[in-house]
């Protein structure tokens, strides 16, 4: 059975926040909407959610945070992913070097690494920490262990790191296992560092040898002389909503039908079996495009 919302959008992807905790203090972080953190779901509770999700035809799960690698039971959680469901993880990379082999062995398919600067001073300004070398070591470990393709998530911050895009292109160029994702800043509080990415996309298009539209997200992938780049633009983007195929689960057990809303969550904590299945159906019923 495949779940479809009232707008005929199938749900095939689940994002699971494992913890609101993080070891960085990024200046723009919205913590996946978790501003009032409570106790996180246990590994057993997450396993039951994944079992039900698989029964509804959800074929991929991405573990997020906070920083998911702060969970001491991370490998246990990864091992509970049902057969046939692809698992990936978004991390800040600071702990990745020490865990890459273990999470790969547990069954994780690949990772996204959040890295907003290749300059140590700028990185520290953005994250509040001086650990860029650890992140770069983690990326290398992910490549070595086959957690690929490794997608590098760079949030574009006007006046801080927007001049580094060519540096990132040089970093990924020539390595087919690295993909650069340039992400529009979520401008919730009129942040001074939000910038319009129209000019950036125009520039990428003019420099590209090939432009491919990804089927899953209907997102363009720009191929620039050995470098693959995607631009992620969730704000005021009708296509982002029209092709959305995911549900989100907060670390304390609430299904989020929409990234940009906080008024339609479905609390599933402590539920299992048929009751949990019904709540999944209700969460999908509440899905509607934020931008139309």
Segments predicted by a language model, with ranges:
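Canonical Radical SAM [4Fe-4S] cluster-binding loop centered on the CxxxCxxC motif
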Residues: 5-44, 259
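Flexible, acidic/Gly-rich N-terminal and inter-domain linker regions that tether
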Residues: 1-13, 21-25, 197-212
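Accessory C-terminal segments flanking Radical SAM cores
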Residues: 188-292
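N-terminal [4Fe-4S]-dependent radical SAM core
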Residues: 1-16, 25-27, 55-60, 219-238, ...
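A short acidic, helix-capping loop that chelates divalent metal ions and anchors anionic groups
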Residues: 34-37, 119-126, 190-191, 266-267
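Short histidine/acidic/glycine/proline-rich micro-motifs that form metal-
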Residues: 35, 155-160, 186-191
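Radical SAM/AdoMet-radical enzyme domain recognition
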Residues: 43-63, 67-178, 182
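Conserved beta-strand segments that form the floor/walls of ligand-binding pockets within enzyme
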Residues: 13-17, 30, 62, 151, ...
